[in-house]
Amino acid sequence: MVQENKNFATAKAKSVRVSPRKLNLVAAFIRNMKVSEALVQLTFSSKRIAKVVKGCLQSAVANAENNLGLDIDRLVITKATVGKALVMKRVMPRAKGRATRINKFFSNLYITVTEKEDN
């Protein structure tokens, strides 16, 4: 079997304690962005989850550099997908002996960086 020359690297952050809707706001923002620009944007973002996304992105860059020998200056984020993980169900007491259910959502984040050719 002949192995192809890979020019992409991936990283994932599983069971992140944030709802997929909120995480997707940050993931959609950095999609198709250069890695260097995305790291700057995530550093100064006001979103709480941006710190986790930045760590996952740095992991993908390290995978590209160390495992595949890719040039980190030419890396672009080609995929940043968000998926649902588990949901913790909690109970909140309410008035008159009632109770309501609270759902605490978790998410999975997958980031793929690809080395783009200079044109």
UniProtKB/Swiss-Prot annotation:
Gene3D superfamilies on file: Ribosomal protein L22/L17
GO molecular function annotations of the record: rRNA binding; structural constituent of ribosome
Source superkingdom: Bacteria
Entry-linked SUPFAM superfamilies: Ribosomal protein L22 (SSF54843)
Keywords carried by this UniProt record: Ribonucleoprotein, Ribosomal protein, RNA-binding, rRNA-binding
Record's GO cellular component terms: cytosolic large ribosomal subunit
Pfam families xrefs: Ribosomal_L22
One GO biological process term: translation
RNA-binding found in the keyword field: yes
NCBIfam families for the chain: rplV_bact (TIGR01044)
Function: This protein binds specifically to 23S rRNA; its binding is stimulated by other ribosomal proteins, e.g. L4, L17, and L20. It is important during the early stages of 50S assembly. It makes multiple contacts with different domains of the 23S rRNA in the assembled 50S subunit and ribosome.
Entry's family note: Belongs to the universal ribosomal protein uL22 family.
PANTHER family according to UniProt: CHLOROPLAST 50S RIBOSOMAL PROTEIN L22-RELATED, LARGE RIBOSOMAL SUBUNIT PROTEIN UL22M
Assembly description: Part of the 50S ribosomal subunit.
Name this polypeptide is given: Large ribosomal subunit protein uL22
Organism: Rickettsia akari (strain Hartford)
Gene name for this UniProt entry: rplV
